[in-house]
């Protein structure tokens, strides 16, 4: 059983955090939350998504899981207005998700959870660098970097967080000293290189966050963590590095 109501914009932003990386996902539902874990087809990026029942106006559920075609789901959510109320109901007989919003009524066919790729385990990473900054700042850096290259370095050097991209002809570098960050902790200088294709997808959601925590090492995956739904949800992205040649 699953029946809930929530602000449409809040829910759309939450689901977008998953749909930026994968086209389908298995969502686990409990009496307290909705969660999902997914990895992209190339095994380069992973997302962990948790949305607490407190994010909803009403929330009634028993333990279960559903498979959702995120492309179709986001098409429906894209029809909602910012202040619309979104009502969700899992029809137990048809195994379809009934969606009502702004006078519109949709019925979304669900996927067999067993047909969806197995959920990944989120690795516990202890990395030497931890940077906290505004999501819009990181999004701006990614947008600048993609003008000159298809990959981007994230690093910390001498208490300064930097973003750097270098192409065949051009180079861009953004430096943010510790004083201009929300916080910075680093036991050593660190640097890793990442695909801008993935970063560009990730910042679509991450760029809206007031605070993003970046856990960073050298030639290690980067971990991005931020809150959604006014602190009633959390999204974690993990992105594998591109190893720089000497």
Curated annotation (Swiss-Prot):
A single GO molecular function term of this UniProt record: DNA binding
Q: How does it assemble?
A: Homotrimer. The subunits circularize to form a toroid; DNA passes through its center. Replication factor C (RFC) is required to load the toroid on the DNA.
The family line of this record is: Belongs to the PCNA family.
UniProt entry keywords in alphabetical sequence: DNA replication, DNA-binding
Pfam family of the protein (one): PCNA_N
Q: Which HAMAP family match?
A: DNApol_clamp_arch
What does it do? Sliding clamp subunit that acts as a moving platform for DNA processing. Responsible for tethering the catalytic subunit of DNA polymerase and other proteins to DNA during high-speed replication.
Is Aminoacyl-tRNA synthetase a UniProt keyword of this protein?
Answer: no
> What organism, scientifically named, is this protein from?
Methanocella arvoryzae (strain DSM 22066 / NBRC 105507 / MRE50)
Please name the GO terms of the biological process aspect recorded for this protein, alphabetically.
leading strand elongation; regulation of DNA replication
Q: What's the protein name?
A: DNA polymerase sliding clamp
Coiled coil is among the record's keywords: no
């Amino acid at each position: 059983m699953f029946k809930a109501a929530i602000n449409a914009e809040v829910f759309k932003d939450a689901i977008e955090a998953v749909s930026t990386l994968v086209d389908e996902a298995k969502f686990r539902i409990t009496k307290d939350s909705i969660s999902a874990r997914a990895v992209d087809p190339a095994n380069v990026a992973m997302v962990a998504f948790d949305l607490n029942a407190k994010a909803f106006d009403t929330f009634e559920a028993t333990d279960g899981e559903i498979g959702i075609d995120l492309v179709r789901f986001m098409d429906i959510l894209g029809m909602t207005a910012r202040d619309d109320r979104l009502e969700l109901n899992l029809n137990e007989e048809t195994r379809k998700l009934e969606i009502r919003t702004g006078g519109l009524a949709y019925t979304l066919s669900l996927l067999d959870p067993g047909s969806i790729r197995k959920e990944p385990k989120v690795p516990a990473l202890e990395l030497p660098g931890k940077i906290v900054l505004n999501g819009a700042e990181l999004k701006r850096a990614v947008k600048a970097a993609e003008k000159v290259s298809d990959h981007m370095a994230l690093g910390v050097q001498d208490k300064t967080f930097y973003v750097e991209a270098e192409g065949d002809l051009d180079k861009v570098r953004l430096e943010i000293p510790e004083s201009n960050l929300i916080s910075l902790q680093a036991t050593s200088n660190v640097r890793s290189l990442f695909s801008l294709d993935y970063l560009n997808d990730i910042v679509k959601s991450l760029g809206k966050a007031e605070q993003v925590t970046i856990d960073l090492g050298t030639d290690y995956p980067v971990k991005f963590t931020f809150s959604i739904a006014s602190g009633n949800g959390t999204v974690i992205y993990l992105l594998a590095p591109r190893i720089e040649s000497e």
